[in-house]
Amino acid sequence: DVCDSLVDGRCIHNGCFCEESKPNGNCCDSGGCVWWWCPGTKWD
């Protein structure tokens, strides 16, 4: 998922946080950032 400011900067469906410098790209969680998708996300 891409990050969505309408859900407090989290990625839709998975609760990861947006990287501030790339609010429409990277998603972050405790494992770090990846491009477009959050680690462990299978369906989004």
UniProtKB/Swiss-Prot annotation:
GO MF: ion channel regulator activity; toxin activity
Name the UniProt record assigns to this protein: Mu-conotoxin-like Cal 12.1.3b
Residues modified to 4-hydroxyproline: 23, 39
Signal peptide limits: none
Modification 6'-bromotryptophan occurs at: 36-37, 43
Source organism per UniProt: Californiconus californicus
Lineage: Eukaryota, Metazoa, Spiralia, Lophotrochozoa, Mollusca
Location relative to the cell: Secreted
Principal localisation: secreted
